[in-house]
Structure formats: structure tokens, C-alpha cells
Amino acid sequence: MSENEIKGILGTKLGMTQIFDEENRVIPVTVVEAGPCVVSQIRTVETDGYNAIQIAYGEIDPRKVNQPLTGHFKKAGVTPRRHVTEIRMDDVSGYEVGQDVTVEIFNDVKFVDVTGTSKGKGYAGAMKRHGFAGQGAGHGNQAAHRRVGGIGAAATPGRIFKGKRMAGRMGNDRVTTQNLKVQKIDADANLILIKGAIPGNRGGIVTVKTAVKGGAHA
């Protein structure tokens, strides 16, 4: 496995705090409890058409695992885990089924991409959901201060185009934040401190991978 190989791990967002760097500057960081995970399957070009490792994370009562997953974990020779994901990579020769994956894989990584589920906001208007400026605030506005305004549906085309930004359910989407700096790694506590904010609530499950736009090939 080369140094520039894409690496990834599952973890839990614990929350945000701040630390000080060598020049005594305050750095806002998100603390992620990353792993330990276990390799539950290896996919190769010969058998699956692509290279990837499947990693499993999180404790779960074996009685709560359905039959297909129970058989899958039994075949791999690992205890059942709550969360499973795949990490695609060019070379899987450095991994084997049953191998532990810890936060130490990021020791030589400077930047990461973090994928999680954003906070659900419920039904939101266009100003909050899309950042629209809104309309006039004066008395002449007939109760349309925060409305969308024109939506482009005149006689032609006679309909509203798909994807038109309007009010609706906001959040609870799969979101990836790219090129976040790895500020610190605590291998003993399975913690990775990432500069800035990452998607999701405290306690949410996130996937941390080497950055595709620089971190993995810097």
C-alpha cells in the first residue's frame, strides 16, 4: 500500500472544541472518534470489477443483526458491527479480512474529506434554505417579504422547471466537506482532530477519507 493510496475509516462525531497551535493561535477543531474498524470484505477487479475494502464499525448486540449480515460477518470471521461501508482504492494488497483499521492510517495525511448526514432543519423557506434575498420590507409589500417571487412559469414553458429552488425540507442530506486539515491525532484514544466543522449532529456517523483533491496526492 503506497503513501498516496486513498485511506478511509468510519467514526463518530463527538463535537467541537478549540486547541492552541505552536504560535499560541486558537484553532477550532471537530473531534472524531475514528474506529477501530475491521475489514469485513475485500473486493477486487477480478471478482467484483473494482478494488475496495469493506470496513465495519460500532458495537451491536448480535441478536439484533439480520440473517444475511450475520452470515456475512461469520464468513469473514469477525463479530457483527453496526455500520458498514466501502472504501474504493487502487490497491488492496495491503489489507486482509479481519484486519483492524485504526486512526493511525492518517499519521502521514495532511488533509481529509469528511462525509456525514447534515442536521435536519425540517420545512424551511427559500431565504433560509437557499439564501434568497427576499423582497421589499416596506408597507407596500403585500405580505410577500420572504416569498420566492417569480418562478418563471408563464405561458411558455407553462410549467415549473425541475430543480427550481423553492421552499421545502432542508437538511438531513448526505454531505461531504472537502480538504479539511488534520490538526492532531491521538492514537491511544482513537481520536482525530479536524480543523473546522464537519457535517452532522454530535453522535453522528461520519466517513473520514484522504482528500481526493490534494490530500491523497500532495
Swiss-Prot record:
Record keywords, A-Z: Ribonucleoprotein, Ribosomal protein, RNA-binding, rRNA-binding
Gene Ontology biological-process entries: translation
Keyword Ribonucleoprotein listed? The answer is yes
Q: Which residues form a coiled coil?
A: none
List, alphabetically, the Gene3D superfamilies matched: 3.30.160.810, Translation factors
Q: Which Pfam families match?
A: Ribosomal_L3
Record carries keyword Acyltransferase: no
The GO cellular component terms are: cytosolic large ribosomal subunit
Which GO terms label this protein's molecular function in UniProt?
rRNA binding; structural constituent of ribosome
Q: Which SUPFAM superfamilies match?
A: Translation proteins (SSF50447)
InterPro entries linked to this entry: Ribosomal_uL3, Ribosomal_uL3_bac/org-type, Ribosomal_uL3_CS, Transl_B-barrel_sf
The similarity comment for this entry is:
Belongs to the universal ribosomal protein uL3 family.
Subunit (UniProt): Part of the 50S ribosomal subunit. Forms a cluster with proteins L14 and L19.
What job does this protein perform?
One of the primary rRNA binding proteins, it binds directly near the 3'-end of the 23S rRNA, where it nucleates assembly of the 50S subunit.
**Protein name, entry field:** Large ribosomal subunit protein uL3
The organism encoding this protein is: Corynebacterium efficiens (strain DSM 44549 / YS-314 / AJ 12310 / JCM 11189 / NBRC 100395)
